[in-house]
UniProtKB/Swiss-Prot annotation:
This is NADH-quinone oxidoreductase subunit C/D. It catalyses: a quinone + NADH + 5 H(+)(in) = a quinol + NAD(+) + 4 H(+)(out). Its main location: membrane. The lineage of its organism: Bacteria, Pseudomonadati, Pseudomonadota, Gammaproteobacteria, Enterobacterales. Residues 1-190 are annotated as: NADH dehydrogenase I subunit C. InterPro entries: NADH_DH_suC, NADH_DH_suCD, NADH_Q_OxRdtase_suD, NADH_quin_OxRdtase_su_C/D-like, NADH_UbQ_OxRdtase_30kDa_su, NADH_UbQ_OxRdtase_49kDa_CS, NDH1_su_D/H, NiFe-Hase_large.
């Protein structure tokens, strides 16, 4: 793979507004469909954004999927209510729009297709004919905006209860509980809600049995320790064999994207921590980088290294929990307690630096909240001396265990084709042999300056391979942390920029103009230029991204949060059919997900 996506690296002005007409895919599209078939939008997303006609959507998608270096992954799909957007110069008239974000692994490039829709004709054809993982994304788009998906195999609510009324991400839908009538749960309403949760196999195209025997339908969750959160999965069983299954999500949904429309650019940062609550600062990274692209902020080198250091600490913390709970799911209890001892050392270090443990909300627009405290280097050095030997003991005592290997090798296995079709990222994708780590191929926050390797599997992603890759990723994160310790730059911890929020405190004590700016930015919030920006990062569980739309206000017009766990849970039925219930437990443990990352 050639790392040629330089518009997303630090060497290029990643926040510059570009139409990407020089991208080869624009020429390929125009050669095939004509020079006037599309409207190309200039954005700060770092990728080509092309408006296509609804009638051409499937044809264009099929063309991109069959190019010599094809766009093989549907990374994201969602919508936007355009009715109140004022800065739309040069764009097709639209009350609503739907976007399709595609990735070409061979090109290391993306493209975003957009379709403009009228309020009186809200419909698009289903993309599931080209990409099976469009299924859940289209269900959520219909649920949140009321955009009909023609030909969809099962267009029902996915995040909200089946009895919910309205489409929450429309601009005329209330964003606060105080704008609704007081909630009442009558006996009749409770019975209605319980009835709505009843699983009817016929609704999902499932048979209740064959001519000779009946199938059994088993509810696993939403309150089950092996479900790793408020997650329900309905199993169609023939004895112990899983004939089919239906994942049921949404129990942890909190409306994170709607919150983004009611919080200032600055005050939304704490909400990012809670998208994937184990990831801490890793979650803050894509959001603040996307906002900095809107603002045109380039942060000092010290900020970049500090952000990388905190991200890798949280990556190790999350991976330790994942590995130990996976071992516990297979049947061994002791490693969990050992892992929590190691995680406590990380929490002590994170708390010393940020003041918090799990949800630090410490990154800022243009920098970090404050400089590193005295003694941070001693704590980090002690941890780096401690952790490598512990990893060796985990691997020797538990992960090389023949029982664990027998329970996990060859279980829930899939190849590169299946991984790409379902939008799998992170270790699940790399286990299939595809070397794709955003830190390497689309470096951000100075990752291009670090020396580390990307662990890759041998061609098949099974439960055991996924776990062992995470172990090696831990070692590489320790390697990155050692470089942070040895090469921490001197300099400021905030950028000298008018939109840095809050601005450097020292100046507020000397200049009344800076004090006024400080007051406005932490109360109303900074005003970001009207534009669109996008940032993806290699998070703890796969690729996490923020796609932000500013309409020149103190708040985001649209905040789209793409999480890896959402895509990974959609893949469950295709990977587990024909396996046993005991295999499902091992598979769920190997995915590495938390439900807040799924449900947002």
């Amino acid at each position: 793979m050639v790392n040629n996506m330089t518009d997303l690296t630090a060497q290029d002005a990643a926040w510059s507004t570009r139409d990407h007409l020089d991208d080869p895919v624009i020429g390929e599209l125009r050669n095939r469909f004509g020079p006037d078939a599309f409207t190309v939008q200039a954005t700060r997303t770092g990728i080509p954004v092309v408006w296509v006609k609804r009638e051409q959507l499937l044809e264009v998608g099929d063309f991109l999927k069959k190019l010599p270096k094809p766009y093989v992954m549907l990374f994201d799909l969602h919508g936007m209510d355009e009715r109140l957007r004022t800065h739309r110069d040069g764009l097709p008239a639209a009350d609503f729009s739907v976007f399709y974000h595609l990735i070409s692994i061979e090109r290391n490039r993306d493209i975003m297709l957009k379709v403009a829709l009228s309020e009186n004709d809200l419909r698009v054809p289903t993309f599931t004919k080209l990409f099976p993982n469009a299924n859940w994304y289209e269900r959520e788009t219909w649920e949140m905006f009321g955009i009909d998906i023609e030909g969809h195999p099962h267009l029902t609510r996915i995040m909200m209860p089946q009895t919910w009324e309205g489409h929450p991400l429309r601009k005329d839908y209330p964003a606060r509980a105080t704008e609704f009538d007081p909630f009442e749960l009558t006996k009749a309403k409770q019975d209605l809600e319980m009835e709505a949760l009843t699983f009817k196999p016929e609704d999902w195209g499932m048979k209740r049995g064959t001519d000779n025997e009946d199938f059994m339908f088993l509810n696993l969750g939403p309150n089950h320790p092996s479900a790793h959160g408020a997650f329900r999965i309905i199993l169609q069983l023939d004895g112990e064999e899983i004939v089919d299954c239906v994942p049921d999500i949404g129990y942890h949904h909190r409306g994170a994207e709607k919150m983004g429309e009611r919080q200032s650019w600055h005050s939304y940062i704490p909400y990012t921590d809670r998208i994937e609550y184990l990831g801490g600062c890793v979650n803050e990274m894509p959001y603040v980088l996307a906002v900095e692209k809107l603002a045109g902020i380039t942060v000092p080198d010290r900020v970049n290294v500090i952000r990388v250091m905190l991200s890798e600490l949280f990556r190790i913390n999350s991976h330790l929990l994942y590995i130990s709970t996976f071992i516990q799911d297979v049947g061994a209890m002791t490693p969990v307690f050992f892992a929590f001892t190691d995680r406590q050392k990380i929490y002590d270090l994170v708390e010393a630096i940020t003041g918090f443990r799990m949800h630090p909300a410490w990154f800022r627009i243009g920098g970090v909240a404050h400089d590193l405290p005295r003694g941070w280097d001693r704590l980090l050095r002690e941890f780096l001396e401690w952790m490598p030997k512990r990893l060796d003991s985990y691997e020797k005592a538990a992960l090389r265990n023949t029982i664990l290997k027998g329970r996990s090798q060859g279980v829930a296995a899939y190849g590169a084709k299946e991984a790409l079709e379902w939008g799998t990222t992170g270790a699940g994708l790399r286990a299939t042999g595809i070397d794709f780590d955003v830190r390497k191929w689309r470096p951000y926050s100075g990752y291009e300056n670090f020396d580390f390797e990307v662990p890759v599997g041998g061609g098949v992603s099974d439960c055991y391979t996924r776990v062992m890759l995470k172990v090696e990723e831990l070692r590489q994160s320790l390697r990155i942390l050692q470089q942070c310790l040895d090469n921490m730059p001197e300099g400021p911890f905030k950028a000298d920029h008018p939109l840095t929020t809050p601005p450097p405190k020292e100046r507020t004590l000397q200049h009344i103009e800076t004090l006024i700016t400080h007051f406005l930015q932490v109360s109303w919030g900074p005003v970001m230029p009207a534009q669109e920006s996008f940032q993806m990062v290699e998070a703890t569980k796969g690729i996490n991204s923020y796609y932000l739309t500013s309409d020149g206000s103190t708040m985001s017009y649209r905040t789209r949060v793409r999480t890896p766990s959402f895509a990974h849970l959609q893949q469950i039925p295709s990977a587990i059919r024909g396996s046993l219930v005991s295999d499902l437990i091992v598979y769920l443990g190997s995915i590495d997900f938390v439900m807040s990352d799924v449900d947002r």
